[in-house]
């Protein structure tokens, strides 16, 4: 072989390297083709049928299981949703889906485990810091869980058939947008709860109580006065007075037990407590420190007055007969305010050390209509006895009842003052039956001074604090007086005296009976001894008599 021929030939190593490179390229291409064909056709219809058989073999139950799955509401990208759900489905198949060995369901679960392991090559795993993003805990039934798994495999199969490399997408940005773990984005239940309305609203007093009809005439007052009136802090003497017509005295509007003070419906009562010598404050300034006490006392008294159907009728009739010929534009009747008198007078610290004081009521006085409402006259209290009280209680309707300056009621001032200091809560809407109200009221108002002096201290300690109304509801007469006096309320002192007395009487009777029994038992043996000895004596005497008589 010449040198030229040798120089024109290629070395064998060069041909070997090129062949090896060609073989490597062909092999890599075939491997890539096999991988793509493997991912695209990895999920078959047989796997979906297995899942359907698992669903059909489950028992329908309401029991729920807890599992973690992707929150589709937070992750709207379908590719990233399936990519995140794949690793969660693996955990569910390995840990949650447990069946008895060698059963059809256990064999189906093993096939699903093999499928999920083969799909690992088709899914790329993102950073571990986004492992729990877009995931929340679900509480659903096993049927719903299997339905989720079936839908996952079905959607994954469809996407892999279109693009086998679709799950290599980087979803870190989508995962970063999700909120923290276990955050439910569903709207909360809009449950409508009854909201608390302020107490000044008439509709909030009670669902069964209509609004007070006396709210309409208060429209002409100032705003602050009307607000205080609705809040039950405005005194009755600060409200505009009204003159009653004799013809419309018996036409009463519907009554209400709301907590507002019905100023235009209440009659002008003649039974009022006398005022102190100090002048009243103006209408715009309520007395500080006493407003709460007056509010509680006014609420109790006005509710009791509203419960009686005959109270306002009797007083309206008497008021109409007081000045029937007086013109409307002339003088008006200025009533003295009982709660204001209570606020002006000092309160006692305790009621046990004080005796009841008889305070007379002041008759109505005629004043000039141009005179301010808050100005009143000062009177001196007078003491009366129980006979005058009963005489005024049973006065005929035709007789002048208000024009006479004589006192009309005797009331115990210690008891109402103590009752004003004790209660701290309102008793709106608590109305007793009419018969029980009149019985209790007549017992309190028609009790004699001796009974008041004897039982005031003991009753304050024995009985619970009862509601007090210084204005009588109606005149019930002698029959209701006896019925009211039979109220079984025994003071504690009487009880302490009665029990030892009864025990002493029983011991005395027992001692007498025992003494009588002993005396009889002691007398019976003597009678027996005498009876045994006497028949022998009598027989001997009879024989002697016979012997003496025979010779004769």
Curated annotation (Swiss-Prot):
<feature type="topological domain" description="Cytoplasmic">
    <location>
        <begin position="516"/>
        <end position="552"/>
    </location>
</feature>
<dbReference type="GO" id="GO:0045651">
    <property type="term" value="P:positive regulation of macrophage differentiation"/>
</dbReference>
<feature type="compositionally biased region" description="Basic and acidic residues">
    <location>
        <begin position="382"/>
        <end position="396"/>
    </location>
</feature>
<keyword id="KW-0399">Innate immunity</keyword>
<dbReference type="GO" id="GO:0060611">
    <property type="term" value="P:mammary gland fat development"/>
</dbReference>
<feature type="compositionally biased region" description="Polar residues">
    <location>
        <begin position="254"/>
        <end position="267"/>
    </location>
</feature>
<dbReference type="GO" id="GO:0046579">
    <property type="term" value="P:positive regulation of Ras protein signal transduction"/>
</dbReference>
<dbReference type="GO" id="GO:0002158">
    <property type="term" value="P:osteoclast proliferation"/>
</dbReference>
<dbReference type="GO" id="GO:0001780">
    <property type="term" value="P:neutrophil homeostasis"/>
</dbReference>
<dbReference type="GO" id="GO:0010628">
    <property type="term" value="P:positive regulation of gene expression"/>
</dbReference>
<keyword id="KW-0732">Signal</keyword>
<dbReference type="GO" id="GO:0061518">
    <property type="term" value="P:microglial cell proliferation"/>
</dbReference>
<dbReference type="GO" id="GO:0045657">
    <property type="term" value="P:positive regulation of monocyte differentiation"/>
</dbReference>
<feature type="region of interest" description="Disordered">
    <location>
        <begin position="525"/>
        <end position="552"/>
    </location>
</feature>
<keyword id="KW-0391">Immunity</keyword>
<dbReference type="GO" id="GO:0032946">
    <property type="term" value="P:positive regulation of mononuclear cell proliferation"/>
</dbReference>
<dbReference type="GO" id="GO:0030225">
    <property type="term" value="P:macrophage differentiation"/>
</dbReference>
<feature type="disulfide bond">
    <location>
        <begin position="134"/>
        <end position="178"/>
    </location>
</feature>
<feature type="compositionally biased region" description="Basic and acidic residues">
    <location>
        <begin position="350"/>
        <end position="364"/>
    </location>
</feature>
<keyword id="KW-0654">Proteoglycan</keyword>
<comment type="function">
    <text>Cytokine that plays an essential role in the regulation of survival, proliferation and differentiation of hematopoietic precursor cells, especially mononuclear phagocytes, such as macrophages and monocytes. Promotes the release of pro-inflammatory chemokines, and thereby plays an important role in innate immunity and in inflammatory processes. Plays an important role in the regulation of osteoclast proliferation and differentiation, the regulation of bone resorption, and is required for normal bone development. Required for normal male and female fertility.</text>
</comment>
<feature type="compositionally biased region" description="Basic and acidic residues">
    <location>
        <begin position="268"/>
        <end position="278"/>
    </location>
</feature>
<dbReference type="GO" id="GO:0030278">
    <property type="term" value="P:regulation of ossification"/>
</dbReference>
<dbReference type="GO" id="GO:0048471">
    <property type="term" value="C:perinuclear region of cytoplasm"/>
</dbReference>
<feature type="region of interest" description="Disordered">
    <location>
        <begin position="321"/>
        <end position="412"/>
    </location>
</feature>
<dbReference type="GO" id="GO:0061519">
    <property type="term" value="P:macrophage homeostasis"/>
</dbReference>
<dbReference type="GO" id="GO:0030224">
    <property type="term" value="P:monocyte differentiation"/>
</dbReference>
<keyword id="KW-0964">Secreted</keyword>
<feature type="transmembrane region" description="Helical">
    <location>
        <begin position="493"/>
        <end position="515"/>
    </location>
</feature>
<feature type="compositionally biased region" description="Basic and acidic residues">
    <location>
        <begin position="439"/>
        <end position="450"/>
    </location>
</feature>
<dbReference type="Pfam" id="PF05337">
    <property type="entry name" value="CSF-1"/>
</dbReference>
<feature type="disulfide bond">
    <location>
        <begin position="39"/>
        <end position="122"/>
    </location>
</feature>
<dbReference type="GO" id="GO:0042803">
    <property type="term" value="F:protein homodimerization activity"/>
</dbReference>
<dbReference type="GO" id="GO:0040018">
    <property type="term" value="P:positive regulation of multicellular organism growth"/>
</dbReference>
<dbReference type="GO" id="GO:0005615">
    <property type="term" value="C:extracellular space"/>
</dbReference>
<protein>
    <recommendedName>
        <fullName>Macrophage colony-stimulating factor 1</fullName>
    </recommendedName>
</protein>
<dbReference type="GO" id="GO:0042802">
    <property type="term" value="F:identical protein binding"/>
</dbReference>
<dbReference type="GO" id="GO:0008284">
    <property type="term" value="P:positive regulation of cell population proliferation"/>
</dbReference>
<dbReference type="GO" id="GO:0002931">
    <property type="term" value="P:response to ischemia"/>
</dbReference>
<keyword id="KW-0339">Growth factor</keyword>
<keyword id="KW-0325">Glycoprotein</keyword>
<keyword id="KW-1133">Transmembrane helix</keyword>
């Amino acid at each position: 072989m010449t040198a030229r021929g040798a120089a024109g030939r290629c070395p064998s190593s060069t041909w070997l390297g090129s062949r090896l490179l060609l073989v490597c390229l062909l092999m890599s291409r075939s491997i890539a083709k096999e991988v793509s064909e493997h991912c695209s056709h990895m999920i078959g219809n047989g796997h979906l049928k297995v899942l359907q058989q698992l669903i059909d073999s489950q028992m329908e139950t309401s029991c729920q299981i807890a599992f973690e799955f992707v929150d589709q509401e937070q992750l709207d990208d379908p590719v990233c949703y399936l990519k995140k759900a794949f690793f969660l489905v693996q955990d569910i198949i390995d840990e949650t889906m447990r069946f008895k060995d060698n059963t059809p369901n256990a064999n189906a679960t093993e096939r699903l485990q093999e499928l999920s392991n083969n799909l690992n090559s088709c899914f790329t795993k993102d950073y571990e810091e986004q492992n729990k993003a877009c995931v929340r805990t679900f509480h659903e039934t096993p049927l719903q869980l299997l339905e989720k798994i079936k839908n996952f495999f079905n959607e994954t199969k469809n996407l892999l058939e279109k693009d086998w490399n679709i799950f290599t997408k980087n979803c870190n940005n989508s995962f970063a947008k999700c909120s923290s773990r276990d955050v439910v984005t569903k709207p909360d239940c809009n449950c409508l709860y009854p909201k608390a309305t302020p107490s000044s609203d008439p509709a909030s007093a009670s669902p069964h109580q209509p609004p007070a009809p006396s709210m309409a005439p208060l429209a002409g007052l100032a705003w602050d006065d009307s607000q205080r009136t609705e809040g039950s802090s405005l005194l009755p003497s600060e409200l505009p007075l009204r003159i009653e017509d004799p013809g419309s005295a018996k036409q009463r509007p519907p009554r209400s037990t709301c907590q507002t003070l019905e100023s235009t419906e209440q009659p002008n009562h003649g039974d009022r407590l006398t005022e102190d010598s100090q002048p009243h404050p103006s209408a715009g300034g309520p007395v500080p420190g006493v407003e709460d006490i007056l509010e509680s006392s006014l609420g109790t008294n006005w509710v009791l007055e509203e419960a009686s159907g005959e109270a306002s009728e009797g007083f309206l009739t008497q008021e109409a007969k007081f000045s029937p010929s007086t013109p409307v534009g002339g003088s008006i009747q200025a009533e003295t305010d009982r709660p204001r008198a209570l606020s002006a007078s000092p309160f006692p610290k305790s009621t046990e050390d004080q005796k009841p004081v008889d305070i007379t009521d002041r008759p109505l006085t005629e004043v000039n209509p141009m005179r301010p409402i808050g100005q009143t006259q000062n009177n001196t209290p007078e003491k009366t006895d129980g006979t005058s009280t009963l005489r005024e209680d049973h006065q005929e309707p035709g007789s002048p009842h208000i024009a006479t300056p004589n006192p009309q009621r005797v009331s115990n001032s210690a008891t109402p003052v103590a009752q004003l200091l004790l209660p701290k809560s309102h008793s709106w809407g608590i109305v007793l039956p009419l018969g029980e109200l009149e019985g209790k009221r007549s017992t309190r108002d028609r009790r004699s001074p001796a009974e008041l002096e004897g039982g005031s201290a003991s009753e304050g300690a024995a009985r619970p604090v009862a509601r007090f109304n210084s204005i009588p509801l109606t005149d019930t007469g002698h029959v209701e007086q006896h019925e009211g006096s039979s109220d079984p309320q025994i003071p504690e002192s009487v009880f302490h005296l009665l029990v030892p007395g009864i025990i002493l009487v029983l011991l005395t009777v027992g001692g007498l009976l025992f003494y009588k029994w002993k005396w009889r038992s002691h007398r019976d043996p003597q009678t027996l001894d005498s009876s045994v000895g006497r028949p022998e004596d009598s027989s001997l005497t009879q024989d002697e008599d016979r012997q003496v008589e025979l010779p004769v």
